[in-house]
Amino acid sequence: MIKILFICHGNICRSPMAEFVMKDLVQKANLQDKIYIESAATSTEELGNGMHRGTVTKLRQENIPFTNHRARQITAQDYNNFDYLIGMDQENLYYMEKRWPNDTDHKISLLLEFANLFRDIADPWYTGNFDKTYADIQLGCQALLEKIKERI
């Protein structure tokens, strides 16, 4: 089982969007018994809160199924429990590298790196642009799934 943890600042916008987009792609590829997906936050600001209404609205518009979600923070154990620790922007990466300073297994990356794009996925909490965030996440998740398919 390959395990993926998507990570953003609050775990209410980008990382849960990536979690449910990836789950949808995995389901459509009939790989749900081979790939496990979760999401988490670098901060404690939104712990226990549900997804942002903009994220919920965008997932519904795109017919991406989702379940009840409550924000959680990354833990030290996540490094051992997941194969991929995927951030959305440089700030996420900074806090991930602080939490797991010895990434000897090279698990830490940014989502758009899988699509050979070396830029951040903008936080719609600040931009209000959930469409752009969704497009970037969809692009990154599709590329990540293709990479994972090579391993299984």
Task: Describe these PLM feature segments.
Residues 1-81, 146-152:
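Conserved active-site segments centered on acidic
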Residues 84, 90-152:
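Phosphate-binding/catalytic loops
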